[in-house]
Amino acid sequence: MLQINVKKQLGKLALQANIQVPDQGVTAIFGLSGSGKTSLINLVSGLIQPDEGFIRLNDRTLVDMESQESLPTHLRKIGYVFQDARLFPHYTVKGNLRYGMKHVSQDDFNYIVDLLGITHLLKRYPLTLSGGEKQRVAIGRALLTDPDILLMDEPLSALDVPRKRELMQYLERLSKEINIPILYVTHSLDELLRLADRVVLMENGIVQAYDSVEKIWNSPIFAPWKGENEQSSVLALPVHLHNPPYKMTALSLGEQALWIHQVPANVGERVLVCIYSSDVSIILQKPEQTSIRNILRGKITQIEIQDSRVDLAVLVEGNKIWASISKWAQNELRFAVGQDVYVQIKAVSVM
């Protein structure tokens, strides 16, 4: 576990954080430019010293200003991936990977190289690599130092769209397979949804919220960040069963099931999905024959009147699902808070 309880004055920015990060998974540090995201991970790495407080990683104290303890950066067992790859141009890819490598067997080396898809690049030099390839090598180099935590500072920000898509696939795989925590700085909603398990929401140096990605996404405090013309709901649901003949997977939603296109996940494994309100309609009675597979019972908990539509929040087995209907439909059907209804979900996006 990573414990951060620090204060730091950085010019006009007063950074303050008090969070505990579990020992696995991706914790995204999210916010606008200048909100203190990079400064927070630099405090963890030792590139910046706090004015007050402490940082502890597992059973080690990285810094404690009260007792004047501070481990040098090179002794903190931290892997750091910057926005730019920062590879040594005079070393091959293999040479870059082996630089700083500690206590790593050949089998582990081969595993990391295969995980990042860079086996065919080992004899090449950085000058001949694409931006995405350079970042994969930089990630591999960081992992091969045998770190207790991996810090990533917007590793996709300098890449064009095709390279971002390419690297994202490897990051998704990486986040599921390595057994150390990852602190991932980003201001991208797409990266947040696809990679993060938890989110630290920062604004003006202060941690505004810290929770699971689905709770942060669905909370009112996050609404201004989404900037959508419609509502959306993010749910993390366990796999209930697979239906191979139809290539479908059922996710457990309390006593009900949410069907999605088949995913390569084991029963019990959680899958993150996003449901947009434009893909949801509301009915009073469950139809007997319909092509829509996802029809779930719930209770209306919130109604918001917009310029050209009405948004309704329906609580389904403890999960809020938004639906958008026309004002005409609302005037005719008179939906009300507390009313039992069914939601028809036409599409579900798997993150």
From Swiss-Prot:
Pfam families xrefs: ABC_tran, TOBE
Stated family: Belongs to the ABC transporter superfamily. Molybdate importer (TC 3.A.1.8) family.
Domain of life: Bacteria
Subcellular location(s) per record: Cell inner membrane
Reactions listed under catalytic activity: molybdate(out) + ATP + H2O = molybdate(in) + ADP + phosphate + H(+)
Record's subunit section: The complex is composed of two ATP-binding proteins (ModC), two transmembrane proteins (ModB) and a solute-binding protein (ModA).
Topology in the lipid bilayer: Peripheral membrane protein
Species annotation: Haemophilus influenzae (strain 86-028NP)
GO CC annotation: plasma membrane
Enzyme Commission number: 7.3.2.5
InterPro entries registered for this protein in UniProt: AAA+_ATPase (IPR003593), ABC_transporter-like_ATP-bd (IPR003439), ABC_transporter-like_CS (IPR017871), Mo/tungstate-bd_C_term_dom (IPR008995), ModC_ABC_ATP-bd (IPR011868), Molybdenum_import_ModC (IPR050334), Mop_domain (IPR004606), P-loop_NTPase (IPR027417)
Functional summary from the UniProt entry: Part of the ABC transporter complex ModABC involved in molybdenum import. Responsible for energy coupling to the transport system.
Residue ranges of every copy of the ABC transporter domain listed in the record: 1-229
Example of a GO MF term: ATP hydrolysis activity
Keywords: ATP-binding, Cell inner membrane, Cell membrane, Membrane, Molybdenum, Nucleotide-binding, Translocase, Transport
SMART domains: AAA
Protein name: Molybdenum import ATP-binding protein ModC
